[in-house]
Amino acid sequence: TFAIEGVSRSLLAQITRHRIASFSVQSQRYVAKDNFDYIIPPAIEAIPEAKKLFIEAMEHDRETYKKLGELLAASHEKELTEAGKDPKDAQKAAKKMANEDARYVLSNACDTKIVMTMNVRSLYNFFALRCCERAQWEIRALATEMLRLVKGVSPVLFKNAGPACVRGNCAEGGMSCGKAVQIREKFANL
């Protein structure tokens, strides 16, 4: 079981494609994201103008989320109060109702928290696919860190875990990164 924090909703979409795992994910419905953190991809981080534009977009999303939340909460609170709900309870319920729709403006870069459970066989499959150089950078970094952690707990069991090229030929065929020797060395020393 892994507790994963500081990853994007984009990573969440990828990792939940592994149906061989059990997931619990932080709710955007019940957890307000007024001051959400976000993940900046390294390629964007490396270009000052791109980074500036990205941060501006995230700040705009944050402000839009807050404003939508306020507008929706006020509307829901009024409806609930008029329907006879206690004002304090109406305010609390209205905020949660507002989050439901305001969250649609949030970017895939928005951070989230995940708890994931996988058995050893499933982990081997996950590592073979997601530690590969062809995997998207964020999930590759997560998979590599997860592998490092499990190797620390059970080095014999996970000795041969990693991308497919660690145990034999690259599974990517013509799309191979061409770095099998370096990859094997990297994962042998992980």
Regions found by a protein language model. Give the residues of each.
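Family-specific signature for flavin-dependent thymidylate synthase
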Residues: T1-L190
